[in-house]
């Protein structure tokens, strides 16, 4: 079974599919013993058990019955993680090889349990809408929000908050008139102040018996309950008409904007009220706060930039030089809001619909820590926003939303391994079990994590520390169990359990054969981004280089000081070029990007699986010609030819590039003449492939159709390996553009060939 087939079954992709047998050996392999795990990986044949799981009775283990458990005829089973002996429930007695329960079958390394515990509240969606935008943008946004109601469960609870200079909380329980409560946009309210201003104490969540008792209470008490904070979140099926009318009646914020000034926008206060109100009303239940912002917050709390246009918004350079005067205070405020949302199991999504930065960098942990969505678009009128927003509500075959709420993620291991940490859109629950390592990597110090929201896209990098110090027999196995509890949109609590086993070895060749260079590159990219959030960019690049040199010194074949003797085996051959493109990527090279763009790109990389992440690191390039089938070509300037069409997929952009000759023929409209039907077909082929890529991608990529010499061709050139540049003398095709030797790239970047040459020199010289 290859690495991708294993991923399709269990949603797990290891950098090393065998672990070093001792802690000392693990310290020498450079790339961490980590795994990429997608808990809600979609599978058509996923085993589903409509009952609660059986747990190991060892309180320090509490793993779940799985196919690796040994079962004896006397009704006992042995846990492979702790080796504890457990009794099976009475209804499991009498099982045999021909009559195994679902979770013990070989095909059930991943299984989902539908538990008997009911969900007391449906999912909750709170729409927080910025009114400081032009009418066209606002109306387009409102239209899409109304369309989204068709995708929500009818019993979903919905709430509405709008903001400009002031914050308005709309009372959906008021039927006769549109009633709302106004909060100042320049004030940070406490939970108690919000509760007091909305006039009533929080209503408790009632079970069926309590509801019957409530119906027998005096009318006065019932009216008090009706005025509780729950009136701001009502079932969509009950208030859809009223909410739609309310949205359609929204207008631009009436507060005047002075010349040379930005609108007074209270983004921070609006988010504070939304997160606090949800926390007061539905703590511990699945909920999303969906922020739609059309510009930066210009009022404290959470001010991103002053309201005078003469004050520029912060850049990467300002932040690096500590010249961004609002940055630290704003980031601290939004981090505190993120912590409050995590505590209450609530998710925050941020949708930006403007050319300006809105402060995503300061607000990033609202999404990163809660598993929320982050989306950048130029306006709410664009298809990037419209289609991406509605794709958030994709459903499964049974019509349920493809999103999990209010989740927890637990990692169990056998005694040979310990959990070092996690990198992904999650938060630590601070549960330090016996299998938690002292050596932290990423979010460490815990084996339990909060997943306020998760989906079939959400992938987490989990890191392990080899705890064993003694040599083990060649047949030694380690076991890992991932347990994900979450609230399903059908109204059930579910548990997704994945159990995997990796062998431990001290044989270097076995380790080499187990190396998955694609997963390793993505895992190292996540570690690099995690480091970038804390360390200087130049230091991070030097660290990346050192790790690559050390890996090659460990696993390459070479003779000391003989560069030409350097050889990498097939398991490692592509890894250096992945690192080369990672070094050049927008994740690390932030010069041409705004801080908001950097936050967005990094957020998406920390969300996606191995294949999608690898496309972000090293984009794919496909060539289309008249006399051949479409084929993958090198991401290199030599791939640009006059008679080619190139399709570039960077994950964030889908670009079709027409070579010089193809472009000239297209401008001459040859494709409209019957005798050139084959040329018309050639022009259509990349469009069809691009449409397939656009169909399921989230967020929707920006589509670019360009040609040699076109202004947007820069998106292609910036991604190509510059093997031919303006200052090289190695051109084959002469001084023109797009000749037989490819195009000249106007850059001072080092080419892959030069990078590899330097790498080889450093490796064979023994330098680090």
Curated annotation (Swiss-Prot):
GO terms for molecular function: GTPase activator activity; zinc ion binding. Its main location: cytoplasm. It is found in: Cytoplasm; Cytoplasmic vesicle, COPII-coated vesicle membrane; Endoplasmic reticulum membrane; Golgi apparatus membrane. GO terms for biological process: COPII-coated vesicle cargo loading; intracellular protein transport; positive regulation of ER to Golgi vesicle-mediated transport; positive regulation of protein exit from endoplasmic reticulum; regulation of COPII vesicle coating; reticulophagy. Keywords: Cytoplasm, Cytoplasmic vesicle, Endoplasmic reticulum, ER-Golgi transport, Golgi apparatus, Membrane, Metal-binding, Protein transport, Transport, Zinc. It is a peripheral membrane protein. Belongs to the SEC23/SEC24 family. SEC23 subfamily. It comes from the Eukaryota. It comes from Lodderomyces elongisporus (strain ATCC 11503 / CBS 2605 / JCM 1781 / NBRC 1676 / NRRL YB-4239) (Yeast). Zn(2+) binds at residues 56, 61, 79, 82. This is Protein transport protein SEC23. One of its GO terms (cellular component) is COPII vesicle coat.
């Amino acid at each position: 079974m290859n690495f991708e087939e294993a991923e399709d079954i269990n949603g797990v992709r290891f950098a090393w599919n065998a672990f070093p047998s001792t802690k000392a050996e693990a310290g020498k392999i450079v790339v961490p013993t980590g795994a990429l795990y997608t808990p809600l990986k979609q599978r058509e044949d996923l085993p589903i058990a409509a009952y609660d799981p059986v747990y190991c009775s060892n309180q320090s283990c509490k793993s779940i019955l799985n196919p690796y458990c040994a079962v004896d005829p006397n009704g006992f089973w042995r846990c492979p993680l702790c080796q504890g002996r457990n009794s099976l429930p009475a209804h499991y007695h009498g099982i045999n090889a021909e009559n195994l329960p679902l979770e013990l079958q070989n095909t059930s390394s991943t299984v989902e349990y539908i538990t008997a515990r009911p969900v007391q509240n449906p999912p909750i969606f709170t729409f927080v809408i910025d009114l400081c935008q032009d009418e066209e943008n606002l109306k387009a946004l409102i239209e899409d929000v109304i369309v989204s109601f068709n995708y929500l469960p009818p019993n979903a609870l919905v709430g509405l908050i709008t903001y400009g200079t002031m914050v308005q909380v709309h009372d959906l329980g008021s039927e006769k008139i549109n009633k709302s409560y106004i909060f100042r946009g320049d004030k940070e309210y406490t939970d108690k102040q919000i509760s007091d201003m909305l006039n009533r104490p929080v209503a408790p969540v009632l079970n069926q018996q309590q509801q019957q008792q409530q119906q027998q209470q005096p009318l006065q008490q019932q009216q008090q309950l009706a005025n509780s904070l729950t009136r701001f979140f009502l079932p969509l099926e009950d208030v859809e008409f009223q909410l739609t009318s309310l949205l359609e009646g929204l207008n631009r914020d009436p507060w005047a904007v002075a010349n040379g000034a930005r609108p007074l926008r209270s983004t921070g206060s609006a988010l504070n009220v939304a997160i606090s109100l949800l926390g007061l009303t539905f703590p511990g239940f699945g909920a999303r706060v969906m922020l739609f912002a059309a510009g930066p917050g210009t009022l404290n709390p959470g001010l991103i930039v002053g309201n005078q246009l003469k004050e520029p918004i912060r850049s990467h350079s300002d932040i690096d030089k500590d010249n961004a005067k609002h940055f630290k205070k704003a980031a601290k405020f939004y981090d505190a809001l993120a912590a409050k949302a995590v505590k209450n199991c609530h998710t925050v999504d941020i949708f930006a619909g403007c050319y300006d930065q809105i402060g995503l960098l300061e607000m990033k942990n609202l999404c990163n820590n809660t598993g929320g969505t982050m989306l950048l678009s130029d306006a709410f009128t664009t298809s990037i926003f419209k289609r991406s927003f509605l794709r958030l509500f994709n459903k499964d075959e049974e019509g349920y939303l493809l999103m999990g709420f209010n989740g927890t993620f637990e990692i169990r291991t056998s005694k040979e391994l310990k959990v070092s940490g996690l990198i992904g859109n999650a938060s630590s629950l601070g549960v330090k079990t016996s299998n938690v390592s002292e050596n932290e990597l990423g979010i460490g110090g815990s084996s339990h994590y909060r997943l306020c929201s998760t989906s079939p896209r959400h992938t987490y990098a989990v890191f392990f520390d080899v705890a064993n110090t003694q040599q083990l027999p060649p047949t030694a196995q380690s076991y890992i169990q991932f347990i994900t509890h979450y609230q399903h949109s059908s109204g059930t609590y579910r548990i997704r359990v994945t159990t995997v086993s990796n062998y431990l070895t001290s044989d270097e060749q076995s380790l080499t054969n187990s190396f998955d260079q694609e997963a390793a590159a993505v895992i190292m990219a996540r570690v690099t981004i995690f480091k970038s959030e804390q360390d200087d960019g130049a230091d991070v690049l030097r660290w990346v280089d050192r790790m690559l040199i050390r890996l090659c010194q460990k696993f390459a074949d070479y003779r000391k000081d003989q560069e030409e003797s350097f050889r990498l085996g097939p398991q490692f051959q592509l890894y250096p070029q992945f690192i080369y493109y990672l070094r050049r990527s927008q994740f690390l090279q932030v010069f041409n990007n705004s801080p908001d763009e950097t936050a967005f790109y990094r957020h998406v990389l920390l969300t996606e699986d191995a294949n999608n992440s690898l496309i972000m690191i090293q984009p794919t390039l496909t060539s289309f010609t008249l006399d051949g089938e479409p084929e993958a070509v090198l991401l290199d300037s030599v791939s640009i030819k006059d008679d080619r069409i190139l399709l570039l997929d960077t994950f964030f952009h889908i670009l079709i590039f027409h070579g010089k000759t193809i472009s000239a023929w297209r401008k001459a409209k040859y494709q409209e003449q019957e005798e050139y039907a084959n040329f018309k077909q050639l022009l259509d082929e990349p469009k069809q492939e691009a449409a397939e890529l656009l169909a399921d991608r989230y967020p929707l990529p920006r589509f670019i159709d360009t040609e040699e010499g076109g202004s947007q061709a820069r998106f292609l050139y910036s991604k190509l390996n510059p093997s031919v540049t303006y200052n090289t003398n190695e051109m084959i095709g002469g001084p023109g553009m797009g000749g037989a030797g490819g195009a000249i790239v106007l850059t001072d970047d080092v080419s892959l060939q030069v990078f590899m040459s330097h790498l080889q020199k450093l490796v064979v010289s023994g330098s680090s």
